[in-house]
């Protein structure tokens, strides 16, 4: 049994969540085209991106002749009314996203892929998040903190954005970017146990 794992992600939240489990993480690049296909549903898009990131990371590992540790990739999508809300590219886009989420319930999909020994294991987790009604002053003050700019849907549940969440049905860590319960189950399939069972 080993606990070393390649994490092909730039998300500091994913790194922190996995380090809290006592895993030795190694960075691995996984650059892909993340453009959505026409009429692609949010959960399908999310799963595809996590899978393609994993395949890209596997190719990098092989090309660089790196040790054969399992590879973990993940992706997160926020969706409301069938529209995918990615990371805002500018402040006005963040304003528009937060206005769409204000006072409403939206879906957060988090896909996780773990590969080892030429096998790929994957799951997708869905959560429903309800925002309180936001005033314009709250939206602009939140955006001024800079927090929304690197997060799908323009908010972070684990930080200041958490004050907008009226109700969560699902996984708190999933909305952060990595559903821990499901992730640990996938890791077990590649012989990484967080705790002995």
Curated annotation (Swiss-Prot):
It is an enzyme of class 3 (hydrolase). InterPro entries: ITPase-like_fam, Maf-like. It comes from the Bacteria. It is found in: Cytoplasm. GO terms for molecular function: nucleoside triphosphate diphosphatase activity. It holds the Pfam family Maf. The active site is at 75 (proton acceptor). It catalyses: a ribonucleoside 5'-triphosphate + H2O = a ribonucleoside 5'-phosphate + diphosphate + H(+); a 2'-deoxyribonucleoside 5'-triphosphate + H2O = a 2'-deoxyribonucleoside 5'-phosphate + diphosphate + H(+). Keywords: Cytoplasm, Hydrolase, Nucleotide metabolism. One of its GO terms (biological process) is nucleotide metabolic process. One of its GO terms (cellular component) is cytoplasm. Belongs to the Maf family. This is Nucleoside triphosphate pyrophosphatase. It comes from Haemophilus ducreyi (strain 35000HP / ATCC 700724).
